[in-house]
Amino acid sequence: MTQATLKQLSQQLAAKQVSSVELASQYLDRIEALNPQLNAIVTVDREKTLAEARAADARLAAGDARALTGVPLVHKDLFCQQGWKTSCGSRMLDNFVSPYSAHVVEQCAAAGMVTLGRANMDEFAMGSSNENSFYGAVKNPWDLNAIPGGSSGGSAAAVAARLAPVATATDTGGSIRQPASHCGVTGIKPTYGVVSRYGMVAYASSLDQGGPIAQTAEDCALMLNVMAGFDARDSTSLERAKEDYARDLNQSLSGLKVGLPKEYFAAGLDADVARAVDNAVAELKKLGAEAVEISLPNTELSIPAYYVIAPAEASTNLSRYDGVRYGHRAKDYKDLVDMYEKTRAEGFGDEVKRRILVGSYVLSHGYYDAYYLKAQKIRRLIANDFKAAFEQCDVILGPVAPTAAFNIGEKSGDPVQMYLSDIYTLSVNLAGLPGMSVPAGFAANGRPIGLQIIGNYFAEARMLNVAHQFQQATDWHAKAPSL
């Protein structure tokens, strides 16, 4: 049962072939058996989960069910969830039990979905490898020596290991697409503003966006139907008509124009990754798509621009963690300032401190124009690049990362090398566009490789259509690690 997709589980629950309690129990048993070696889940509460499952079964029996009622999921540990610890992978919030729920969590609860637990993540979503968690690194289910990708590494590893059929996640610079690629699962980051950020603990507010990680594009579409929607409590939430993201899944790809950015296939791209992407493009051509070369000339500027803008926003967002009202507080201090200093020194990890320092520096008097303002201008140029590209094509294809997953510890001593692994994902966030990762093969060492699909604003249904048709023609998404 734990190998089934979201769609299959939904059908089995509706047909009364399995109950939500039975389903939740099977997944909880699997988490208990496999999570000690993966470290993908940081919090489990069997009683709460089974209570939610019983409520879902009551809805199913009463005929009051929705499409995903009774289906279990895990939430990335930065979505506030009432009564559950919401740690953000940080010592700072290790003791924080949320008094309210995020909009995404509310939407999932309203749909009747059942929470299995909370997924591990890079601290405050800062990282590309999920080695920055206070609770320890997450292991890649395909190779326990490999990173799962970050920052939503726990979400991706949980879905890949079939500890859950679907997981919520967030993407600020690639944090859904990177781990989905490295763990051989499907993930989509929607257009900025499609999913409410209310109750989603902020890293960089102009870049953060929630989305699902699941086994298939169809599952992602079903989950996005639950997660998306206007929320007045988030000032960046977009007021748009409700949309069915699964509506175009079965459309033909005949006449589809696929853009291949020449900058994405330059030096630094691993041969295994290039081969997987080339094979995926060939597969789409067989389905009727046409490939055109495009240019995104400011791609290489996305790294310096992102690593100015994101830390700047993080430094202001994380200034609220001072030990006064909630979270970690230092035990011994002389006065208020001493308490602030010791609390933050003890509560934050190295990568978070590094980004706070950079962010504070670029926002300081005398440097704001030289760095922050310049980065925002580059951001506009990057958005313009995409605007021009989408006049020539319907979707853009390329790699998610330059290589398959690297080893745990391999890049942790060199932050710049770690940042370079985000080269193909950052510009999508800077432009506010939707992007997704679809399993597209394996490297010679057996580690998964993802294909990145980038769409124009609000083109999620079209991207999911491309991904679904690709998955109908291939079986990369159906392969599971042997644990």
From Swiss-Prot:
**Catalytic reaction(s) noted:** L-glutamyl-tRNA(Gln) + L-glutamine + ATP + H2O = L-glutaminyl-tRNA(Gln) + L-glutamate + ADP + phosphate + H(+)
Q: Where is the active site?
A: 76, 151, 175
Matches recorded under SUPFAM superfamilies: Amidase signature (AS) enzymes
**Molecular-function GO term, any one:** ATP binding
Q: Which UniProt keywords apply?
A: ATP-binding, Ligase, Nucleotide-binding, Protein biosynthesis
Recorded E.C. number(s)?
6.3.5.7
Gene Ontology BP terms = translation
Q: What does this protein do?
A: Allows the formation of correctly charged Gln-tRNA(Gln) through the transamidation of misacylated Glu-tRNA(Gln) in organisms which lack glutaminyl-tRNA synthetase. The reaction takes place in the presence of glutamine and ATP through an activated gamma-phospho-Glu-tRNA(Gln).
Q: Quaternary arrangement and interactors, per the entry?
A: Heterotrimer of A, B and C subunits.
Q: What is this protein called?
A: Glutamyl-tRNA(Gln) amidotransferase subunit A
Q: Which organism is it from?
A: Chromobacterium violaceum (strain ATCC 12472 / DSM 30191 / JCM 1249 / CCUG 213 / NBRC 12614 / NCIMB 9131 / NCTC 9757 / MK)
